[in-house]
Amino acid sequence: MDGAFPGCGVMIHHVSGDADPLFQTDKFAATQPDPARQLAEVKKKAGDLAQRRQALAPAIQLLKNAVCVPDKPCPVFDLPWQVEQSKSGKTSISGLSVMANMVETLRLGWSENLPLSQLAWDHITRASQITALLPLLTENYDLSNDVFYTAQKRGSILLNAMLEGVQEGATPNVRWLLLVAHDTNIAMVRTLMDFSWQLPGYSRGNIPPGSSLVLESWRDTHSGKRYLRVYFQAQSLDDLRRLQMPDSQHPMLRQEWRQSGCQTTDVGTLCPYQAALTALGKHIDRQSAPAVEMALP
């Protein structure tokens, strides 16, 4: 907050307990997926995992070259991809998930400006090398948080809060509401919104550090008509590494949501307000979206 509003002393509000209903939905009964159905939905979407793995062979080989010692065993890259479910009911793709974690670790190291010697032992020296690995993250999103049933059970409560936040009479009554979420939360919400993006230097649907999913409420002062602008934005890999402040020479990378009836304007893509709210909220599971109070103290 000090970065956005230096010297203003803006307070940060948070839940008093250990679990936040908007972001830690695995802690609450209303937002818990049924394990059997979740397993079935993941298997249905996954299809032929061997074929999926083969399609990503180039990215897998690049990752192996980066993190494995030449001529030494690196068994994780020999594992078949399989759908697995833990005792807690969480479903994942063994083999893929560990590769995705490796890629995320390398991407975070790059973004945090770690010395190149600490990035896969000097094997990662250019942003383009990170870009080439990111399809593995996209694949992991596709088969986890982007599975529609999972997103609907766990993301409905957050999307509902976001849409309520841009309505007239919303609580809290503020001009700018920032919800600090994980990439997993954004992934589930964008799935329900039918909103995907591909920013330059990133794979489809990638959610970089510091990125944001933005909803803006606009009103035409002449006609009184209301509009909604929705977009996803992030900085480039190189700008993140340099801690580059966004400016005219280093603009934010941005992709806007649109549907029929939206119009391109000087301030961005504006969509008729009620039609946009209806479209963005049509997949919300109301039973998984109990009311959340965000009144300021």
Residue ranges and their predicted role:
Residues 1-177, 183-297:
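Signature for phosphate-centric chemistry
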